Amino acid sequence: MASSLAPATKAATNLRLTHSLRFSPKPNNLRFATKPGNTLLCTRVKAQLNEVALDSSSNATSPPMKAKSKEEPPAKPLAEPSSSVLATQESVSQFITQVASLVKLVDSRDIVELKLKQHDVEVTIRKKEAMPQPPPAPQPSVVYSPPPPALPPPPVPASTPAPTLARATPTPTSAPAVKSAKSSLPPLKSPMAGTFYRSPAPGEPSFVKVGDKVKKGQVVCIIEAMKLMNEIEADQSGTIVEIVAEDAKSVSVDTPLFVIQP
């Protein structure tokens, strides 16, 4: 060991340091034995260097010595997510899936409100009907005003009695006596029902008139029945004293037509 350290000790005396050195406060003494009976005192030097350059003045140059740098500790691998974190993420995912399925359930069923609580999370699902509705707007108050009193109707003027015209009573004449005399005679009666005509055609003179003398079998009028013109003849000879039936009027069977005085 002494023979191997001798060249190193000799070379150390001719070294030139290119960097600052930090000496320990209490250097430790090392003893190297070169020859029997001789001792060499050398001081151990601690240098905080990355690299030391050596320069020798002798012909024999020694190779540069490299100080061993402190090895950096290997980078720690990223910590893998713990099982508790994975379990939490998985539970949250399952919880969200459950909430989505519950929303579909509430929409498809007659459910107004649903509450779900799992661990420290609570979810409330409400339909629109369950949400608090805003208070209705106050309706405007209607003030009722009574209608104005109706005006009294105007007084009705007293109706004046209409003047009555005094009918002049006709003075009795001898006509009633004549009529009574005619009424005693048997009249010429209608043998059928129909329409009584005094003339053969409109606008022509009548067959007979009051005061005319007629003979038995003479045509005195026409009665229209069933669209047929039926001539009516006098039942006796005499004077026409009265025409009882009205022209162009309906007559029935045995209706008096004329009064003939023999």
Swiss-Prot record:
Pathway: Lipid metabolism; fatty acid biosynthesis. Residues 161-185 have a biased composition (Low complexity). Pfam families: Biotin_lipoyl. Residues 185-261 form the Biotinyl-binding domain. InterPro entries: 2-oxoacid_dehydrogenase (IPR050537), AcCoA_biotinCC (IPR001249), Biotin_BS (IPR001882), Biotin_lipoyl (IPR000089), Single_hybrid_motif (IPR011053). Residues 53-84, 125-185 are annotated as: Disordered. Its main location: plastid. GO terms for biological process: fatty acid biosynthetic process. Transmembrane segments: none annotated. PANTHER family: BIOTIN CARBOXYL CARRIER PROTEIN OF ACETYL-COA CARBOXYLASE 1, CHLOROPLASTIC (PTHR43416:SF38), DIHYDROLIPOYLLYSINE-RESIDUE SUCCINYLTRANSFERASE COMPONENT OF 2-OXOGLUTARATE DEHYDROGENASE COMPLEX, MITOCHONDRIAL-RELATED (PTHR43416). This protein is a component of the acetyl coenzyme A carboxylase complex; first, biotin carboxylase catalyzes the carboxylation of the carrier protein and then the transcarboxylase transfers the carboxyl group to form malonyl-CoA. This is Biotin carboxyl carrier protein of acetyl-CoA carboxylase, chloroplastic. It comes from Glycine max. The lineage of its organism: Eukaryota, Viridiplantae, Streptophyta, Embryophyta, Tracheophyta.
